[in-house]
Amino acid sequence: MQAPYLHKGNLSLGERRGPMNYYAAKELADSFRTVRKNTLLIAQDIPQEKYAFRAAPDTRSVGELLAHIASACTLQYQLHAVERRSSLEGFDLPSFIKRVLAEETQPRSKDQILEMLRGSGEKWAGFVEGLTDDFLAEQVQMPPGTTPPSKSRFEMILGVKEHEMHHRGQLMLIERLFGIVPHMTREMQSRLAAAAAKS
């Protein structure tokens, strides 16, 4: 069955929902909070003195990458919460991105970055969990020449979590370079060891 937020027919959202397992605002917010919680645990595991480390030239440092993650919902928050845009036509995306990137690169301590992650994460999740089904189903027109020409708000909002998980994978590899076993791997190893001990 086609996902309700991607359906472009004339049925109402309730009519087109059908017997599927429904994934709505509460689930979006809960899953984002889980992702952000794990990002915070990685940020806590990496020592302050490693926050300036860059895995390669012309890449973000650990601290900059974490600040980027903390800021990643800024664009979608502006589009959906502040302006509630139905089209990106006329939106000055380059200037907005430039301002966000400048904010990301401000010098910060580890504690400041952790607080930034906590604050932005809860602000975003708090917004998402209050959204209606109809709002999530709305289509937003992309800039002219973009493929696809429109996206549902659901897809755009879900993209915030996908973006964070992409960068979290980079951080987990960087942890390995520092000799740190990522916490999710440690937890899995512990579960496997406990299961083996019972067999």
Task: Identify what each model region corresponds to.
Residues D58:
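Conserved functional hotspot residues or short segments at active or partner-binding sites
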Residues F32-T39, V62-Y77, P107, L114-W124, ...:
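Alpha-helical transition-metal enzyme core signature, strongest for iron centers
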Residues M1-P19:
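N-terminal amphipathic/basic-hydrophobic helices that include classical n-h-c signal peptides
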Residues I46-Q48:
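Membrane-proximal, proline-rich intrinsically disordered regions
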Residues R153-E155:
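Short alpha-helical transmembrane interface motifs in multi-pass membrane proteins
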Residues F53-R54:
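Surface-exposed patches in mature extracellular/periplasmic domains of secreted proteins
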